Amino acid sequence: LYTTFSGGRATLYGHNHPANMRRFSGTTGEDVTDYLVRNQLEMLKSLKDDDPRSRDITAIPTMPQLRTTRHIRGVRTLTTADVFRPAEDSVCLINDFDNRDSLYEVPLGCLVSEDADNLLAVGRAASAEGYAWDVLRVIPPAILTGQAAGAAAAQAIDEKCSVRDVNIPKLQKTLEAQNVLIHMTPDLLPKDGAEGHI
C-alpha cells in the first residue's frame, strides 16, 4: 500500500505531513517534478528506516497525486454554507464522503466560468472553496458534474445560446431522465434534522 509510505504517512486530512515540507501548487512542470522527487525520497527514507520484516508490499504510483491545483472562478462558488441549501439551478445532488447525510445541490453556476464564455469545469476543477471543495473533488461528484456539464453543453448548442443561458428546467428534466438526482427530498434528509450533520 503506497499510502503507508506516502509523504511520511500523511493522511487524507493532512495529518502526519512531513515536517518542513512546502506546499506544492502542481501548476508548473518544475513544481510537479520537485513534488515527485521529494515524495520518492521521503518514501525511500521511510523504507530504509523501517524494519524490513514489517513492511507492507508497496507499489509506487507513476503519477503525481496532487489534490488541489487550479480551479475556475465560477458564476457561483460552492461553500460549506450550501449544505442542505436548495439551489434553483441545481444540476445534481451530491453528499459529503465523510458524512453521507450532508447533502449539497450543485448549481450550474459552479461549473460555468465567470471569466471565459462557454467554459465548463467539473469535479475538482469546478468553483468551490474550503471543505466544500473536498466534497466536490471526489469521483462520484466528478462523474455527476461531468454528466451535467455535457448535458448543458449539448443543450446550449441546440438552443444556440451561451451555456450560462440554457433553460435550467429543461436541463434538469434531461438530467432527471438520466436518473440524476437534482434536488433534496424529505426522504433524503436526516431524520434527526440537518443541524447535527453540518
Predicted regions and their residues:
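Flavin (FAD/FMN)-binding glycine-rich loop and adjacent Rossmann-like elements that form
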Residues: L1-I198
